[in-house]
Amino acid sequence: MSDAPTASALKTPVRVSGPVFFISDLHLSAGMPATAAAFERFVRTRAREARTLVILGDFFEYWVGDEELADPFHRHVAALLAELAQAGTRVLLMHGNRDFLLGKRFLATTQATLLPDPSVLEADGLRIVLAHGDALCTRDAAYMRFRRWTRKRWVQRLFLAMPLRWRLRIAQKMRADSEAGRALSANVAGEPRAAAMMGDVAPEAVDALFKAAGIPLLIHGHTHRPRLHHEPGGERWVLSDWDFDHAQPRGSFLRLQDGVLTAEPVTA
């Protein structure tokens, strides 16, 4: 379950070996077979070049508890991560806003290590602040209220005590409502689907995170707007989402090697 971010997570870096690959927002589900296939190819080819793979949230479209491992699709994806770990690539995982209920059973099955949000990573002589990114969208007051409630452990315990079929229905309803809201926003604003996916981060929240960490380098996902930003507090890299099941397929990862960050495409 989700860990509340603490000041100690920013002051105590997680030290890893490079090359390090960063991905986020794959939103894996059985309903997105081409995206899932792209991830499987990535795990069995490019990801083997990395000593460390960092997944910065929303790895799954939704996750309502570790009973999801009984589902063949989710079990196969978990096996892919375990296969990668057994091949020698360390897997680090951060919760996203869709999969913050990934728990101890999933971590044990995949041999992954959970990162608090935010965290600091140290590799190749660099210190990097890592976040999923949703906590930086502070101008979305309704979402921030929802986030505060759903990260409370007692709320999570109550939800996990429900029958699995109830939890799945709730998640599917929330997913449908979210998609409808995005489509409406895109139509009203006249924006393309990718640009209207969700609200962007608040500059003041980004600045506060830079100051709290004291590190001028940040990597996050969530917004589906991949780009390198030069902020007053430092460089901010935004990771791409992955989608190979709709028009305008997209997907990339960020490589850290020899102290240099580069964005590289993922092939379908």
UniProtKB/Swiss-Prot annotation:
<keyword id="KW-0443">Lipid metabolism</keyword>
<dbReference type="GO" id="GO:0005737">
    <property type="term" value="C:cytoplasm"/>
</dbReference>
<keyword id="KW-0378">Hydrolase</keyword>
<keyword id="KW-0464">Manganese</keyword>
<feature type="binding site">
    <location>
        <position position="97"/>
    </location>
    <ligand>
        <name>Mn(2+) 2</name>
    </ligand>
</feature>
<dbReference type="InterPro" id="IPR029052">
    <property type="entry name" value="Metallo-depent_PP-like"/>
</dbReference>
<dbReference type="GO" id="GO:0009245">
    <property type="term" value="P:lipid A biosynthetic process"/>
</dbReference>
<protein>
    <recommendedName>
        <fullName>UDP-2,3-diacylglucosamine hydrolase</fullName>
        <ecNumber>3.6.1.54</ecNumber>
    </recommendedName>
</protein>
<feature type="binding site">
    <location>
        <position position="222"/>
    </location>
    <ligand>
        <name>substrate</name>
    </ligand>
</feature>
<feature type="binding site">
    <location>
        <position position="58"/>
    </location>
    <ligand>
        <name>Mn(2+) 2</name>
    </ligand>
</feature>
<keyword id="KW-1003">Cell membrane</keyword>
<feature type="binding site">
    <location>
        <position position="25"/>
    </location>
    <ligand>
        <name>Mn(2+) 1</name>
    </ligand>
</feature>
<keyword id="KW-0441">Lipid A biosynthesis</keyword>
<feature type="binding site">
    <location>
        <position position="178"/>
    </location>
    <ligand>
        <name>substrate</name>
    </ligand>
</feature>
<comment type="pathway">
    <text>Glycolipid biosynthesis; lipid IV(A) biosynthesis; lipid IV(A) from (3R)-3-hydroxytetradecanoyl-[acyl-carrier-protein] and UDP-N-acetyl-alpha-D-glucosamine: step 4/6.</text>
</comment>
<feature type="binding site">
    <location>
        <position position="191"/>
    </location>
    <ligand>
        <name>substrate</name>
    </ligand>
</feature>
<feature type="binding site">
    <location>
        <begin position="97"/>
        <end position="98"/>
    </location>
    <ligand>
        <name>substrate</name>
    </ligand>
</feature>
<dbReference type="GO" id="GO:0030145">
    <property type="term" value="F:manganese ion binding"/>
</dbReference>
<comment type="similarity">
    <text>Belongs to the LpxH family.</text>
</comment>
<feature type="binding site">
    <location>
        <position position="58"/>
    </location>
    <ligand>
        <name>Mn(2+) 1</name>
    </ligand>
</feature>
<feature type="binding site">
    <location>
        <position position="27"/>
    </location>
    <ligand>
        <name>Mn(2+) 1</name>
    </ligand>
</feature>
<dbReference type="GO" id="GO:0008758">
    <property type="term" value="F:UDP-2,3-diacylglucosamine hydrolase activity"/>
</dbReference>
<keyword id="KW-0444">Lipid biosynthesis</keyword>
<dbReference type="InterPro" id="IPR043461">
    <property type="entry name" value="LpxH-like"/>
</dbReference>
<keyword id="KW-0472">Membrane</keyword>
<keyword id="KW-0997">Cell inner membrane</keyword>
<feature type="binding site">
    <location>
        <position position="132"/>
    </location>
    <ligand>
        <name>Mn(2+) 2</name>
    </ligand>
</feature>
<feature type="binding site">
    <location>
        <position position="222"/>
    </location>
    <ligand>
        <name>Mn(2+) 2</name>
    </ligand>
</feature>
<dbReference type="InterPro" id="IPR010138">
    <property type="entry name" value="UDP-diacylglucosamine_Hdrlase"/>
</dbReference>
<keyword id="KW-0479">Metal-binding</keyword>
<dbReference type="GO" id="GO:0019897">
    <property type="term" value="C:extrinsic component of plasma membrane"/>
</dbReference>
<dbReference type="Pfam" id="PF00149">
    <property type="entry name" value="Metallophos"/>
</dbReference>
<feature type="binding site">
    <location>
        <position position="140"/>
    </location>
    <ligand>
        <name>substrate</name>
    </ligand>
</feature>
<comment type="function">
    <text>Hydrolyzes the pyrophosphate bond of UDP-2,3-diacylglucosamine to yield 2,3-diacylglucosamine 1-phosphate (lipid X) and UMP by catalyzing the attack of water at the alpha-P atom. Involved in the biosynthesis of lipid A, a phosphorylated glycolipid that anchors the lipopolysaccharide to the outer membrane of the cell.</text>
</comment>
<dbReference type="InterPro" id="IPR004843">
    <property type="entry name" value="Calcineurin-like_PHP_ApaH"/>
</dbReference>
<feature type="binding site">
    <location>
        <position position="224"/>
    </location>
    <ligand>
        <name>Mn(2+) 1</name>
    </ligand>
</feature>
